[in-house]
């Protein structure tokens, strides 16, 4: 059944998860589906970036650990990671601040599923920007992008399982290359006309309900 296959895909995401402690002293801030783009009309993150930066500064100063649960980068509509980094330089600097402090971890989603390739972090995330002296600065060297994170409850053994969630949907998991093609060449142009992407559970209530029922 579809439910059984969804369960298998979700279980697979937790075969080699990142394990983090959960107790009365740990503090986590969770972000998902930022979909950082290249600054064009389809960049849904752009208008919220100031709020994002303000919240990251607040949570950093208060000792939180940053968890990004997938689709941080819109790599279905856009091909260039470099352009995304250039457009949202301040956001990347803020994340780098957490990472340098050992307080940033990331899960890949369907729209940035290419991050699961081992060479991808080395190519795109080792360095990020140039400072005022034109010296290239480190971003997140040796970063790992996980399929899932488990917060291990050290008090009541009630662990919290974190993943992006696309594993529950066949079109956005196993058939993601097809979905990317449809988004990049069909739904992206139509979105500019105000027509929502039907492959997205976030923009399609019927798909959203079905995905939630499978989890």
Where do the PLM segments sit?
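Short, flexible active-site-adjacent loop segments at beta-strand->alpha-helix junctions, enriched
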Residues: 110, 155, 164-167
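Compositionally biased, intrinsically disordered low-complexity segments enriched
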Residues: 4, 37, 113, 166-168
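Acidic, histidine-bearing metal-coordination/catalytic regions of metal-dependent phosphoesterases
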Residues: 1-27
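Active-site-proximal loop/helix segment associated with metal-binding centers of metalloenzymes
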Residues: 160-215
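Generic hydrophobic, helix-prone segments enriched in Leu/Val/Ile
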Residues: 1-2, 10, 59, 84, ...
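Alpha/beta-hydrolase fold active-site loops
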Residues: 26, 158-160
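Core catalytic region of metal-dependent phosphoesterases/phosphodiesterases
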Residues: 25-27, 31, 36-153
């Amino acid at each position: 059944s579809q439910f059984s296959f969804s369960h298998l895909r979700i279980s697979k995401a937790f075969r080699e998860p990142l394990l983090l402690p959960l107790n009365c002293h740990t503090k986590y801030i969770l972000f998902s589906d930022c979909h950082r783009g290249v600054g064009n009309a389809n960049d849904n993150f752009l208008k919220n970036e100031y709020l994002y930066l303000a919240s990251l500064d607040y949570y950093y100063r208060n000792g939180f650990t940053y968890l990004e649960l997938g689709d941080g980068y819109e790599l279905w509509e856009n091909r260039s990671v470099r352009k995304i980094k250039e457009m949202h330089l301040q956001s990347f600097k803020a994340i780098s601040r957490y990472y340098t402090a050992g307080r940033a971890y990331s899960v890949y989603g369907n729209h940035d599923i290419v991050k699961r390739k081992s060479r991808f972090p080395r190519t795109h995330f080792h360095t990020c920007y140039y400072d005022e002296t034109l010296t290239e600065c480190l971003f997140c060297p040796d970063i790992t992008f996980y399929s899932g994170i488990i917060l291990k409850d050290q008090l009541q053994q009630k662990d919290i399982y974190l993943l992006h969630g696309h594993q529950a949907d066949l079109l956005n998991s196993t058939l993601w290359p097809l979905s990317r093609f449809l988004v990049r060449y069909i739904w992206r142009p139509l979105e500019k006309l105000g027509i929502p992407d039907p492959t997205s559970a976030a923009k399609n209530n019927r798909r959203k309900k079905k995905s939630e029922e499978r989890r």
